[in-house]
Amino acid sequence: LDIRTKLALALVFVSLLSMGLISIFAYQTSAQLLQDVSVRQLDALAEGKAMDLAKVHQGWRDKTRLIRNGAELHNGIEALISTHDDAAHQTLTKILTHTALGVAGVERVTVVDTAGREICQVGSAAVFGAIELPEGERDIVYQGVHLSEQKGLLVTFTSPLVVNGELIGGIEVVFDADDLEKVASNFTGLGETGEVVVVTPSKNNKVLVLNSLRHVDALPSPGEIPEEQISEP
């Protein structure tokens, strides 16, 4: 090959090498940009889910307040406390059945006296233990979540019952978790592989998953899984 041909081939090689380097740089830059965009999108989705879950939680609190503040309920409780007779108990049971159980998502309502002793209850959700009345200035208190074999995930709130400035007892309201499930099962923006996992700490290095998962065959409904499983792909 003469010198001109060699120079031409060298220039072509340099040009191809430059194009290759530019392509690699452009690919890496594009990949990083796509990754950054994906992370920002996921952050935005997570923030949106958190806001939706906060609204669900506030909805439970509002419903508890609505039930607690009912004038019929107050009259029924005062009548039962003053008379302790069966007629007053039946009346209070009817009031709770028609008002409290008529509120969407309510599974069980229990009324206790100032000593925490049950005086009336309606609903079919399991009893999880002694009812703890809020102390001090606390109004409505979230008491936690529980798994029931019959009802699935249940959410519990308690509140003191005050009539004319006097504490007459307390109320426990147990909700199903359907509203939470609706939020968690909305996979908009997550494609076919994305997953929404709502968890709360449990014991023995486990977490309680509060919603059903679409990619974990062993957990089609709320339940406990090891902590490390949350980070698995």
Locate predicted features:
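Juxtamembrane extracytoplasmic/periplasmic/luminal helical "stalk" adjacent to the first N-terminal
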Residues: 3-87, 98-107, 153-157
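Short, conserved clusters of charged catalytic residues that mark active-site
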Residues: 8, 48, 91-95, 175, ...
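Extracytoplasmic/periplasmic ligand-binding sensor regions of membrane-associated signaling proteins
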Residues: 55, 93, 97-174
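Short N-terminal helix-loop-first-beta-strand/juxtamembrane motif that initiates sensory/input modules
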Residues: 59-69, 98-118, 185-209
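A structure-centric signal for secondary-structure junctions around beta-strands
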Residues: 61, 106, 151-153, 167-168, ...
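Conserved helix-loop functional segments at active or binding sites
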Residues: 73, 109, 141, 179, ...
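Polar/charged, Q/E/K-enriched amphipathic alpha-helical segments with strong coiled-coil propensity
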Residues: 80-85, 91-92, 181, 223
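Intrinsic low-complexity, intrinsically disordered coil/linker regions enriched in small/polar
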Residues: 120-122, 164, 175-233
